[in-house]
Amino acid sequence: MLAVRFISPAQQQYEHAFMYPVPPESLVTLQDRSSYLVEHFWDRCNMKSIFSSRKNLEQSMDDYFSFMVYADSAVVMNSIDRLIKEVKKSGPNMLTMAEIARAKLYSDSAEYRSDELYLPFAKAGASASGVSKEQKAAYQLEISQLENSLVGKYVPDVSLTLRDGSVHRLHDYNGNYFLIFFDEPDDFDNMMARVKLSTDYGLNDLITKGQVQVICITPGKADDEWKARVADYPQNWIVAAAEGTDQLFDRRVKPSFYYLNRDKIILSKTLVADNLIEAFRMVRNSQNRIREERERLKQEALKQREMLQKQEQPMN
């Protein structure tokens, strides 16, 4: 869990490029104090001079993002919108800030990874004056991927071609939960994930009971070469190929997994196979405990009924 740093004015004079806000004593909860810091973070910053030192700007943005961890989400998004509105007056400055935001919120090494927070910076970078064609294309791809695969959003209804050549829509499938596995047949890490998931007793038990469906999607065409490569994939998985998914899905973390509910809403992503297996084990154990408790209560009810029936029988 990330800690929010509260900094005294004396410390700020020597450690920061400008004076950070100090929450009033009337704000006592962590969320309220964090929200105040986020809302007023840039109040004393000279927006012209801060960009003269990239090091100072990076450190300031690092602190800014760290305060967001416990802040109110509406306050956070409003603060980002106001910041972008101010910085966007200069195209080069906006591109610099978008680049730093990408490193701190979106990249593989991002300390505060957050798709929701990065998205407005990506949009601002894509529309900044002076942005190159290459930069704009890169931002637009990230925007498309993120907007279509945010947690809490409906997963795109892509067309799937199965091993037998039949074509279906992703949203055609019914079930309680879905594990979408974006597969690359020749990749070693993907192969290891397939082996672990296909041999996991907990997941297979949930599949058999109809609790979870695994949909394994290879981005690309469903040609004969693909069919040969996936011929030995688990028969209790829905194995498909789908074109155009690279534009729709965020696949920074590979192997890529998405976990959906029955309405095809994304519950989680950037999952790891080992963590999935542990989660499925816990779900299965929980279901077993519930089933055992129901059976115990049922047996107790039957015993009580038998006792009542015996008491109601007339004595000879």
Question: In which residue ranges do the predicted regions lie?
Answer:
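Active-site proximal loops enriched in glycine and acidic residues that flank catalytic Cys/His/Asp
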Residues: 181-184, 216-221, 241-244, 261-262, ...
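Short, internal strand/loop/helix patches
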Residues: 227-263
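Thiol-/selenol-based redox modules, centered on thioredoxin-like
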Residues: 259-316
